[in-house]
Every structure is written in structure tokens, then in C-alpha cells.
Regions:
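N-terminal secretory signal peptides and thylakoid transit peptides that target proteins
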Residues: 2-22
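Glycine-/small-residue-rich beta->alpha transition segments that form the dinucleotide
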Residues: 137, 141-145
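A conserved short coil-to-beta-strand element within the FAD-binding core of flavoproteins
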Residues: 113-122
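A short, basic/flexible loop-to-alpha-helix module at the beginning of a structural domain
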Residues: 23-39
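Core beta-strand elements of the Rossmann-like FAD/NAD(P) dinucleotide-binding domain
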Residues: 129-137
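SH3/SH3-like beta-barrel fold
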Residues: 125-127
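Beta1-alpha1 glycine-rich phosphate/pyrophosphate-binding loop at the start
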Residues: 35-109
Length: 145
């Protein structure tokens, strides 16, 4: 191969390619959207904080027919980046607190209890009250606490 036909990896080549791709995307008119997938999967997300709620939103956008359940006993959702604004006196104390259900997508179910047991052999979660929640897929998004 001659030097003129080889692709050269350089910052200039990358920026040129990225600029061309950005221009092409800007002129496309409609945003790219992933195709929806039909499924009857039972998906349980353990934790309804920022990660669990975000995942539930993405899954309901992309999956048709999935049974999406979140399990979290905490009734309030804490917007943690707002804590610094409260501490600085820029926002009132209640600024960063809202209801957990305010952040969940339509079509997702919230079991407002804490999980007591994960039973991977039976593919189920047992809540603090003894309710059994079966799953095909489990996501543990309980955060740091």
C-alpha cells in the first residue's frame, strides 16, 4: 500500500472526521432513535434513586411489553447535586427532595418496600413484608448507602 491510501491516525484527521460527522448529523432532520424491542421480560431494579430511575426510563423507552418493577422503601427522592446549593444558602432546605414516583416513567411499577432477600436460584426478591417479586433480569442499583 502506498502512503496516500493508508489512513493516518492523527489529531487533524480525527477532528476532520468528527466535524464531518457532526455536520452530517445536524442536517439529517430527525434524531436517531433505537428501534423498540418486543419482550415479555420481567425486569426488577433494586433501588429507585438516580441510577434506578434513569435505567427504568431508558428501558421503558426501548422495550415493548417488558414488566419493569423498582423496589425501594424510601418514599422521597434526593437530588444530591442540590445539596451544595442548599449548604451555600442559595436554595431552601426542601429544594432537593421530591417524591420517588415523580421520577418514574409511566409503565414502571414501584414496590415501596425495602428488599430483605435476593434469591438468585429462584430468580426472586423477597421484600421486608415477605412479598415475593419474581424476575428474569435483576439490576442492583442501591447506591452507596
Amino acid at each position: 500500500m502506498s502512503d496516500t491510501t493508508q489512513l493516518r491516525a492523527s489529531r487533524r484527521a480525527f477532528l476532520g472526521l468528527a466535524g464531518g460527522a457532526a455536520a452530517l448529523m445536524a442536517t439529517s432532520g430527525t434524531p436517531a432513535q433505537a428501534a423498540r424491542v418486543k419482550t415479555s421480560a420481567r425486569i426488577v431494579i433494586l433501588g429507585a434513586g438516580a441510577a434506578g430511575a434513569a435505567l427504568a426510563n431508558r428501558l421503558t423507552e426501548r422495550l415493548d411489553g417488558a414488566d419493569i418493577t423498582l423496589i425501594d422503601g424510601r418514599p422521597e427522592h434526593w437530588y444530591q447535586p442540590g445539596f451544595t446549593l442548599i449548604a451555600a444558602g442559595l436554595k431552601p432546605a426542601g429544594y432537593s427532595v421530591s417524591g420517588t414516583t415523580d421520577w418514574l416513567p409511566k409503565g414502571a411499577t414501584l414496590v415501596a418496600e425495602y428488599a430483605a432477600e435476593i434469591d438468585p436460584e429462584a430468580n426472586r426478591i423477597v421484600t421486608a413484608s415477605g412479598q415475593s417479586v419474581p424476575y428474569d433480569y435483576l439490576v442492583v442499583a442501591t447506591g452507596l448507602d
